[in-house]
């Protein structure tokens, strides 16, 4: 690996090449669904919360969303993987979008069948029934209500 970078450099370089990697992933990088899939979402902050009023680069694309580190403007990455860890599909939305967004799942259901394992953010009876009618069984954690 003559041109390999360290992990620290990789973390610094990743935001610079993230949007260049998306078209590559759409063309080359997706795996095949084998009947068992996993889905989750995570926040991609575009700037620190204190600088949100001055950030104009992603002004039209980003919304304020709450992640594990608190509120910040950013995007939400919805990621669908198969059981061996291959990315099946991904979708970027504003950070305040719900995990059960119908537009995201319209994209996901094109490559999906079988069982999908998700966290508690995907619990909703109507959403479960909609996927079940398409032949997709949603498996999620129990809600503590």
Describe each region flagged by the PLM.
Residues 1-145:
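Short alpha-helical elements
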């Amino acid at each position: 690996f003559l041109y390999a970078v360290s992990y620290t450099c990789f973390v610094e370089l990743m935001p610079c090449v993230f949007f260049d990697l998306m078209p590559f992933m759409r063309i080359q990088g997706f795996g095949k669904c084998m009947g068992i899939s996993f889905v989750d979402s995570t926040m991609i902050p575009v700037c620190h919360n204190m600088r949100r009023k001055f950030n104009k680069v992603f002004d039209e694309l980003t919304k304020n969303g709450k992640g594990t580190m608190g509120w910040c403007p950013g995007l939400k990455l919805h990621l669908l993987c198969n059981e061996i860890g291959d990315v099946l599909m991904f979708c970027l939305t504003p950070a305040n979008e719900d995990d059960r967004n119908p537009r995201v799942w319209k994209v996901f259901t094109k490559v999906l069948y079988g069982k999908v394992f998700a966290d508690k953010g995907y619990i909703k009876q109507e959403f479960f029934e909609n996927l079940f009618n398409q032949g997709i069984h949603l498996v999620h954690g129990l809600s503590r209500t």
